[in-house]
């Protein structure tokens, strides 16, 4: 199951883009196969860095939580590997376990740097 629930406020998606709909589809596939709920915590909402792709509807943040709360780190590791393998190469970035991304996984579609 996919759940849309912001950490500080509601999740807002201004103009769903095909590139990110594919990410949501892959999240749903992982969720069904792993038997977990993937929570999308941010799309085009609250504050992000000035050049963030969240504002262009080309990025999302998500997490998988343990039953009692807290991030399910090993499941998040599996999710990061799954997305890296299943999203087409070239423009998708999966950011996990880097500074600022220790509690959520960030996925963006960014061809600017290539």
Mark where each language-model region is.
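Short coil-to-beta-strand
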Residues: 1-2
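Catalytic cores and adjacent binding grooves of peptidoglycan-active enzymes
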Residues: 5, 10-18, 49-58, 64-114
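Extended, low-complexity, intrinsically disordered C-terminal regulatory tails
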Residues: 18-51
């Amino acid at each position: 199951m996919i759940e849309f629930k912001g950490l500080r406020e509601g999740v807002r998606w201004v103009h769903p883009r095909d590139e990110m709909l594919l990410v949501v589809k892959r999240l749903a596939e992982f969720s069904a196969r792993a038997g977990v709920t993937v929570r999308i915590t941010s799309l085009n909402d609250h504050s992000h860095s000035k050049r963030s792709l969240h504002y262009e509807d080309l990025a999302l943040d998500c997490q998988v939580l343990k039953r009692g709360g807290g991030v399910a780190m090993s499941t998040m590791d599996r999710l990061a590997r799954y997305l890296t393998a299943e999203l087409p190469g070239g423009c998708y970035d999966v950011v996990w376990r880097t500074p600022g991304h220790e509690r959520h996984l960030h996925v963006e579609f960014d061809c600017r740097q290539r």
